[in-house]
Amino acid sequence: MVENKSSYELPDQKTLDMNKEWVQELEDIFYSYKKYDVNKVRVQQFLDRRSDFLVYDFYTSNLSMDAMQYFQAGVTQKDVGLSKDYILLMRKLYSMLTEPSKQFFQEQFVKEWQYHEIDYTPYFETLVPRFREKIARLLDEIVKNPEEVDDDVQEELRWHLLFSPVTTLLDIFTRCLKNFEITGFCLNVCLKVPQLFFDRPLKIYHTEYETDRVESLMALVFRRLIFNKRWVDTSDEEWSNLEQLARVICSGQEPSLMSAWPLLEVVLCELYTQNRTPMISVEVLSEIAVKIVENFDNLKYATSARTKPAENVLLTPSIICFLLNIIVDENVSNTVIENCKMILKAIGQNMEQPFDAEAKSYLTSKVLKEFPWTLEFAISTWFKALEVEKRRIPSAVYKAINAEMKETFDERTFDIEESETVDQSINEEDEERCSTLSSESSVKTAISIDHKSDTAVDNLEMNQLHLSPKPKASVEAVKSCKPAFVAVIFEEIPPETDQNISVFEDPTIEVLTEYLDCIITMGVFDISCADELMRHSSVTFESSEQLEKVMKTAFEENFEIANAGPQRIKEISGKILEVFGSTSSESDHDRIASSIIELIPTEEYEKTGPRWSHDIKKSEIIQPLVIPVEATLESWPPAEYRYVAPGIKESRDSARHERLLRQQLATTKSLEMAQLHRDLWAENEKNMEHWTRPASPCNSSFFAESSVKPTTSSAYGNSSNFSRYAD
């Protein structure tokens, strides 16, 4: 390959002559394409001719402009073979340019490609025989030894990337997921075509699974890569490499091929779309979002629930809502839940401006109240932008708060009206189970339900009735109807004797257990929020033995602990012992924590579920939480004048019909008169002499002595005009 270096100095005469001849011939061929009069033999001879020199930079600008100016004619020849030859001519020209000239060529080619409203690159690929196979062979060569790749292979891959960016880049990234060691080399090739990257908006063809809009090449390819990997069985290693690829793309050399904002937008939109198969794809996407939100502090956050997606900011209210919905989804993994919590926490810490009044009211009054208290408390704590004056907590925790701190908290109650609303949403099947649950439950269990903490009801709901947890108050709804629930099943137990048969001998233990149950539930969701509640608590334990007993009972009865692993259980128990067991030694803390971990079953379940899916929904764009209703102008006439009496309506219809007939008659007469005028005008010979093309003069010389008089039209004068020259 000829050394590709810029040379603005005038080359030697021999090279300059070769340049002139070569450039002139290529210009003639390009011009023949413009006239659709191409000599196929000449084109083939030009392509077969070997040229071992670089085109002088002085000629390349005009030559590149000609190639783009005639490009549309070149790829639309009647003979498809000639169109394919035009692409080969452009490829030959591109290979003989210096690096600065290649950059100019690339810029002009992208302009020509983007000039049209429709993306024609899928058609371009048909003009290159075995286009995808060539890309695959090039990538195979790169995989053999990524450190030592021939320059010809690199330049060929670069040309394919310029010629068809989406297909080539998608194939490159797909291979990078399988052979991650070639990522560095492939990204260097991308850097050689900067006209396609660095968040430049491009008009690109979108499939039916994508929202058609102008966006960057990297954003579209990354989204399509996720789609393709969900469509087929993809290994965990490839999904892990996808996360690494996103990190390399955004955190590489400056400026990076893709900034953090468009990548985060793609990832959040994919989480927003109801595509949850395979689950590992959701885990990877949420992990990417966590890394971006935590490490990039220059992101913009919407403070209004009406902010539109086009404003290039994160729609924070909408993001809060759909991430909370993912967290309470029973089908998502713990990894996804933890990542969503980290995203929300990072966004809350990064937001500097408070939400506007409408967004605050909507989120606190309508959204957060629909979720369990742990989510409401955590969001109110993380998002200072909500400016929540009093964070709501359950009664068991609220009663234990220090008197001086109670002004910053509020008791979360469950109204009867809300309970009735929730009851309507409960399954009839579940209601049947509630009403017909019978002798399989022991009397001891039933008695403890009526007199223990609300936790026992929670356990019964989850373990014995097999009810699905509901976002709003599946637990609280059952708590609200607990006395009636127990009375239906155990009618033989007199209410006045309930206090004597409680499973707890000491009512203080019952209160403490209920309190720790709430703290554990909060700790499973967020350990820092649980620690804050304990620090503001007035609860005390008489001894370390009492604390250990209450902790074991609370951990054993808490159904949320099933979502926590051994490490989280150790953290929660450690925090409880740190706050309430300060008199105990560290060895006692370790012993108690170890005994609790042994008490809680922590079986590790294998990841199951489909590895791929063809039931993939169209990728959606995050929408505003509140979509304003645009005011429409009232139709005319006003409503009070729209009534028309029956007789008037027929009269108006008749008049309208008559007007249409007269209009048609007038139009017909006008056309006839215009045609008659044109015919009469054309019959006039005088008009025809001035408006028609004159006859060509004869070829005889003006000074020739000939008896034959030249025949000319009056437009060139009669023969007498030339007689004076003949004399």
UniProtKB/Swiss-Prot annotation:
Effect of disrupting the coding gene: RNAi-mediated knockdown results in enlarged deps-1-containing clusters.
Main localization category: cytoplasm
Pfam family, one: TPR_Edg1
Subcellular location: Cytoplasmic granule
Segments for region (Disordered): 703-727
Protein function: Plays a role in regulating deps-1 cluster formation in the germline.
Subunit structure: May interact with deps-1 and prg-1.
Protein name as catalogued: Protein edg-1
Lineage: Eukaryota, Metazoa, Ecdysozoa, Nematoda, Chromadorea
Gene for this chain: edg-1
